[in-house]
Amino acid sequence: MSNRKYFGTDGIRGRVGDAPITPDFVLKLGWAAGKVLARHGSRKIIIGKDTRISGYMLESALEAGLAAAGLSALFTGPMPTPAVAYLTRTFRAEAGIVISASHNPFYDNGIKFFSIDGTKLPDAVEEAIEAEMEKEISCVDSAELGKASRIVDAAGRYIEFCKATFPNELSLSELKIVVDCANGATYHIAPNVLRELGANVIAIGCEPNGVNINAEVGATDVRALQARVLAEKADLGIAFDGDGDRVIMVDHEGNKVDGDQIMYIIAREGLRQGQLRGGAVGTLMSNMGLELALKQLGIPFARAKVGDRYVLEKMQEKGWRIGAENSGHVILLDKTTTGDGIVAGLQVLAAMARNHMSLHDLCSGMKMFPQILVNVRYTAGSGDPLEHESVKAVTAEVEAALGSRGRVLLRKSGTEPLIRVMVEGEDEEQVTEFAHRIADAVKAV
């Protein structure tokens, strides 16, 4: 990643009303993006958003900036991030823009872009947009101004796309599913997809009011889903995050099934069906149990840096078609171009239907290792704790004790002065003790 002023690993994000998530900045961003992206002749930009109240304000600002650059905006209304990627491809638009802060609270928001082929923008294009931001806005002639229109069938188009990734010969008619849409962008999509495929659906987190997105619901907080699955005696639960690019599941016993387990199920099923090409990509945080389970199946496994952007880069580098983060970003390049919670969830449901197995049983081939994470705050500017000899010494001792049946990972937070200490192994008590021993060494620096 180069040093960029505004763009992070997943677009531009922050608290609404604080720079850069302000109406004036976003208007200029729309103009700058329009100047850079007007390359392919369609002069159309798809704009989607999640259910945050600030989405309307930022949508208007973007549209004004794009119009000034001579590009027309096509609004989808509340729509999952992967749906915008899909619609950008099918409309052959210059680009797609998503107004969302994903799993963050309602008072945050962000802007991220998709290129004409439905993938994240290359670094060079983001850098060109930033360079354009330094210039004064110049408006095209009145006759060339962009227009605004709405894609009235956006939801229906995406629902049909999702359903098409589920095998025609299978049905969900025997499954009772609780779906939690985080009061976010999937609220009018996911329940309909599942119902149209035959499932008995109980929907929660499907009443967005602009300020309740991700609030004690969704992929980042599955407690409400776990309780409802047990209360309804459902076969499983499926949770999405606010913009629908993550999925976490819950089995009939209320156990959480994370992105690592979801990828294991999909990869194993792909192998059984003779459809898996190459291996699977996880991250530095992926559970060691995933790596060992895939190894037993003869499926190669590689780790990327944390972040779906880096997972995709590693997949492209190796020519592999499946990758995931344990947080629930699952990328299936045979189906789509980006992480898609609904599509990933459907592949797990297909494995359940095809094999007549419960979600719990599908997970049984993978033993999750206890993974303890301790965050240690340090004083910024006081040197790098990870380079201190005492920290290195304790880390080496722990690694030697764990041997090949465990891992230690120390990494800095990208957003605040925190060291994240992760220790993983077979014995939870031992792993906890080791994690706190390393954390104490970091604190003592």
Swiss-Prot record:
Mg(2+) binds at residues 102, 241, 243, 245. Its EC number is 5.4.2.10. Its cofactor is Mg(2+). The modification Phosphoserine is found at residue 102. The active site is at residue 102. It is an enzyme of class 5 (isomerase). Activated by phosphorylation. It catalyses: alpha-D-glucosamine 1-phosphate = D-glucosamine 6-phosphate. Pfam families: PGM_PMM_I, PGM_PMM_II, PGM_PMM_III, PGM_PMM_IV. Keywords: Isomerase, Magnesium, Metal-binding, Phosphoprotein. CDD domains: GlmM. PROSITE patterns: PGM_PMM. InterPro entries: A-D-PHexomutase_a/b/a-I, A-D-PHexomutase_a/b/a-I/II/III, A-D-PHexomutase_a/b/a-II, A-D-PHexomutase_a/b/a-III, A-D-PHexomutase_C, A-D-PHexomutase_C_sf, A-D-PHexomutase_CS, Alpha-D-phosphohexomutase_SF. GO terms for biological process: carbohydrate metabolic process; peptidoglycan biosynthetic process; UDP-N-acetylglucosamine biosynthetic process. GO terms for cellular component: cytosol. Binds 1 Mg(2+) ion per subunit. One of its GO terms (molecular function) is magnesium ion binding. Belongs to the phosphohexose mutase family. Catalyzes the conversion of glucosamine-6-phosphate to glucosamine-1-phosphate. HAMAP family: GlmM_B. PANTHER family: PHOSPHOGLUCOMUTASE (ALPHA-D-GLUCOSE-1,6-BISPHOSPHATE-DEPENDENT), PHOSPHOHEXOSE MUTASE. This is Phosphoglucosamine mutase. The gene is glmM.
